[in-house]
């Protein structure tokens, strides 16, 4: 069964620990941990200096709470976007997390990740 053919529940079960690792690593400003599940395409664009600048200038991405909830999946081509409701330990309100997953070499990898 291809990755994109899995049910939403199956994909969310795979996505939750990946998202959790992104949160933990981002809060610790840990480049190696943050990029460990990146696809080769994402790694190519994930410059450690640029990520460091983002961590320094954006309070939200280093204060993410482990209180998150996946609420849906969108399929497009070879990728699935998992949407998360995310909160922060310092910023008020709820934020939208977006995690784009796909298969690379038989493993589920990150092809995109953002928070709004």
Residue locations for each model-derived region?
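Short, well-ordered alpha-helical segments enriched in acidic and aromatic residues
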Residues: 27-41
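Catalytic subdomain that performs nucleotidyl-dependent activation
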Residues: 106
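Short, low-complexity N-terminal intrinsically disordered segments enriched in polar/charged residues
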Residues: 1-28
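A solvent-exposed, acidic/Ser-Thr-rich amphipathic alpha-helical stretch
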Residues: 40-58
């Amino acid at each position: 069964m291809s990755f994109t053919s899995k049910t939403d529940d199956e994909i969310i079960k795979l996505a939750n620990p990946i998202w959790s690792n992104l949160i933990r690593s981002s809060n610790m400003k840990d480049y190696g941990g943050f990029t460990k599940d990146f696809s080769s395409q994402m790694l190519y664009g994930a410059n450690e200096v640029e990520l460091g600048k983002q961590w320094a200038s954006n309070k939200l991405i280093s204060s993410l709470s482990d209180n998150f909830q996946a609420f849906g999946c969108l399929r497009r081509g070879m990728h699935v976007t998992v949407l998360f409701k995310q909160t922060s330990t310092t910023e008020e309100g709820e934020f939208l997390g977006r995690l784009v997953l796909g298969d690379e070499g038989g493993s589920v990898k990150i092809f995109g990740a953002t928070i709004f």
